[in-house]
């Protein structure tokens, strides 16, 4: 379902762009999961390639952003990121479970928006634009920080110790 849905969306967009003879600068947010052996990653990569082909054929600016794990306010639990899921679970008294304690490459949503604005201002024409992560952490580190923020801030009414921009952004999530 997700494979077909993602590709249908891009195909409909390309058809609309062609029908209207649009020369709009299109920015696609793809995923660092493009290279994983799953239907989500495959659909994201194929969608990006479809738009890149349209842009090349029509001599139009296209930025295909390959984005690391995004976190920040308004993330949806069980959908956007493990940060949103853990935050939701902790806030609701649930016990988060770590499936795989892997290393995550992360970017805060505000930092991602800045990257997108830069791409627009610079008219970045790159079908495979790799957005650099601004932080890296193990899943267990994220969980530990989020749990400590809840304990210190919510339970005890104290501002937790924040040591860097990543921790500030995580706290603001």
Spans of features found by a protein language model:
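Conserved beta-loop-beta element that borders a ligand/cofactor-binding pocket
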Residues: 52-75, 88, 94-105
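Conserved catalytic-site region of short-chain dehydrogenase/reductase
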Residues: 32-39, 70-74
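Hydrophobic alpha-helix immediately C-terminal to the catalytic Tyr-X-X-X-Lys motif of short-chain
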Residues: 46, 50-54, 86, 142
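SDR active-site strand-loop-helix element
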Residues: 26-32, 65-67
């Amino acid at each position: 379902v997700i494979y077909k849905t993602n590709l249908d969306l891009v195909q409909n967009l390309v058809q609309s762009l062609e029908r209207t003879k649009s020369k709009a600068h299109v920015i696609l947010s793809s995923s660092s999961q493009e290279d994983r052996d799953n239907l989500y990653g495959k659909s994201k990569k194929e969608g990006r390639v479809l738009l890149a082909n349209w842009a090349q054929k029509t001599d139009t600016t296209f930025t295909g952003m390959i984005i690391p794990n995004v976190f920040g306010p308004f993330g949806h639990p069980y959908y956007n990121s493990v940060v949103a899921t853990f935050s939701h679970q902790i806030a609701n008294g649930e016990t988060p479970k770590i499936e795989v304690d892997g290393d995550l490459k992360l970017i805060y949503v505000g930092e991602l928006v800045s990257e997108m604005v830069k791409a627009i201002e610079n008219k970045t024409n790159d079908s495979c634009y790799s957005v650099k992560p601004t932080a890296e952490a193990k899943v267990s580190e994220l969980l530990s920080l989020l749990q400590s923020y809840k304990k210190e801030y919510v339970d005890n009414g104290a501002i937790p110790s924040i040591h860097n921009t990543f921790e500030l952004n995580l706290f603001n999530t």
